[in-house]
């Protein structure tokens, strides 16, 4: 019933404008008629659970039925998440303060929960710091995050009285990138997304991992660029794909730093994998998690754990030259 309810909500909330623009984009990229694209989209929704964005970003218009069956689509991803993760425990990941407390062994930085803090607590936290990082309690994808210079606000009362701070729920130390990660882009934490699955025998498996990289002045790496990482060698496997996946932009060289993406050697990959495998056992009721991991000069730390894992990271055309999706994995 929950699955059918989700499907109904998605269809009800579908945007005709976005659907139309997606059909136009698929038409331009494939050369097929808009009517043929629309009818094929409807078939792929019914047969493979593929939404219109899935159809575009995975280039379903270029795939055979056998290839289409290998892709984790939006509805398959949602169904798998609902099966693997007990919703009663997901708040331990979604709420920043609860996550930091439960996973303190892995986070590698101090934080302050403003709902429980006083102005005096904030002033003490900021002592000796040039900058702090601010987050809302439960928003995702970097929405609402700010990096503030401590010298820019007159007193700690800013966090309690200023309208600009109403969304801030936690403040924390600014994460410093490992020098080899900073070379990729130095204005954001370039994090690895590592997906783990905890099986019925309590064994943790790493399904895939990608390196996210900031771009064009952004202070976060969300919606910038990313590429899969080889867990054995620690090297980036392919050119990076735009984080705004429908754009289909591919970056062989980082436009801001001039670094060649494919083949870049990342530090501490084995250590990061070992860390998330350990973290995956902390809340065994949540078995399918996307861990955002930063590599600092002192080693890897966990930024956050995501209970709804993006299904596009490992399946985009520039990263799947064999046109085979995640399901066989």
Question: Predicted regions span which residues?
Answer:
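Active-site nucleotide/adenylate-binding loops and adjacent lid/helix of ATP-dependent enzymes
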Residues: 82-201
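Conserved N-proximal alpha/beta basic substrate-recognition cap immediately N-terminal to
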Residues: 9-124, 140, 276
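Short, solvent-exposed loop/turn segments at secondary-structure junctions
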Residues: 138-141, 176-177, 201, 211-215, ...
């Amino acid at each position: 019933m929950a699955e059918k309810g989700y499907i109904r909500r998605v269809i009800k909330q579908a945007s005709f404008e976005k659907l139309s623009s997606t059909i136009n984009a698929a038409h331009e990229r494939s050369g097929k008629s808009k009517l043929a694209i629309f009818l094929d989209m409807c078939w792929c929704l019914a047969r493979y659970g593929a939404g219109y964005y899935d159809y575009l970003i995975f280039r379903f218009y270029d795939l055979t039925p056998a290839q289409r069956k290998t892709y984790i689509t939006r509805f398959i991803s949602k169904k798998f998440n609902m099966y693997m993760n007990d919703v009663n425990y997901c708040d331990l990941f979604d709420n920043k303060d609860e996550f930091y407390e439960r996973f303190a062994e892995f986070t590698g930085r101090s934080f302050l929960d403003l709902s429980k803090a006083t102005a005096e607590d904030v002033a003490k936290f900021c002592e000796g710091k040039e900058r702090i990082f601010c987050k809302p309690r439960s928003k995702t994808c970097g929405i609402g995050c700010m990096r503030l210079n401590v010298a820019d606000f007159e007193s700690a009362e800013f966090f309690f009285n200023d309208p600009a701070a109403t969304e801030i729920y936690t403040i924390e130390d600014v994460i410093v990138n490992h020098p080899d990660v900073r070379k990729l882009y130095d204005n954001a934490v370039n994090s690895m997304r590592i997906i783990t699955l905890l099986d019925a025998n309590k064994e943790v498996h790493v399904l895939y991992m990608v390196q996210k990289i900031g771009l064009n002045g952004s202070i976060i790496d969300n919606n910038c660029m990313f590429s899969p990482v080889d867990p054995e060698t620690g090297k980036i496997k392919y050119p990076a794909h735009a984080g705004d996946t429908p754009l289909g932009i591919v970056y062989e060289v980082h436009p801001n730093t001039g670094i060649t993406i494919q083949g870049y050697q990342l530090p501490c990959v084995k250590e990061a994998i070992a860390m998330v495998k350990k973290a995956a056992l902390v809340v065994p009721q949540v078995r399918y998690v996307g861990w955002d991991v930063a590599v600092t000069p002192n080693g890897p730390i966990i930024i956050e754990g995501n209970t709804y894992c993006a299904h596009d990271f490992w399946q985009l055309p520039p990263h799947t030259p064999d046109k085979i999706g995640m399901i066989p994995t």
